[in-house]
Amino acid sequence: MLGYTLISRMPKTALLLLGLVAACSQRTLTLVDLYSDGGLFPPSLDGNPGNSFDGVATTYADSSAFPADTRSNDSSDGATPAGLRRGLVGLWHFDDAVGSKVAIDSSGNGNDATLVGLDPTLAWVAGRQNGALNTNGLGYASVADSDSIDSITTQTTLAAWVYFDGVIPVDYGTAISRQITTTNEQYYHLSLYQDGTPTLFIGFSASIPAARPTAPQTVAQRHWTHLAGTYDGSLATLYVDGVAAGSRPITGVFPLDTRPVILGGNGNAGAVTEWFPGRLDEIALYNRALSPDEIRLLATAVAF
């Protein structure tokens, strides 16, 4: 029979070691945790240069017993970089050239975003990964309606890295939104309240109260934070840095419409307002609800 030894938290110059070892009648996996200055680092995908091996190991009978963050690259639940492309409607890296008036969509669906009210010589700045869009509360990027955007009906995921400058003069600073009708009840958006508290809005009609899960704490100013929101057909869930921060039950279907998706603003009652005061990076939009493991992987800033 075969067993598996997995060593994580290797020094930067070392390689991840996966060795096959002889065992008796049942497959086992040994997960070796590394230590630094005598402290335990739980198994993780991100690595930490400078850690050293102290010879401590944990054995698992199979991969279903792995700690959650170690299993998040297990293809059985779809939480792989390649799996993150399933159901992708739009992906904006904001790695566009200085002077460009367009943010290219990397999903393959052609949902490029056009800058509105932003100086293209100033809008492109350093980001969480490579470049970012600096809306700075002055404008936004608009994505025209398309068949792929209209495929968002019974489920969705919104995600973005946000760098909050600290001043929101109106109700929200919005990372991504789509108002589906002229009323305020039918749209989705991922935003910060004026005090910097993350919130997700999922609404279908005036007759169905909107779901507004809100985090229990504000985000740090001038610091990159990953926000994500999912709607799976019955529950709206907000995530902050890959961790669920609140949820609300709601059931409905997003109606078809021709209005755009807005990056860095809120299409509120027909006008785009509530611009985001800071930088945005790696905005992703899906026509399905990502799993908690997929959200956690998305928040590790892996390329996909």
Predicted regions and their residues:
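Localized edge beta-strand/strand-to-loop motifs within extracellular or lumenal beta-rich domains
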Residues: 223-237
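Short, aromatic/His-centered strand-loop micro-motif at the edge of beta-sheets
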Residues: 201-226, 270
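C-terminal motif of bacterial Sec signal peptides marking the signal peptidase cleavage site
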Residues: 21-23
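Extracellular glycan-recognition modules
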Residues: 85, 89, 98-103, 138-201, ...
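Flexible glycan-contacting loops in extracellular carbohydrate-active proteins
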Residues: 248-279
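Bacterial signal peptide processing site
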Residues: 25-27
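Extracytoplasmic low-complexity segments
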Residues: 31-33, 50, 58, 62-65, ...
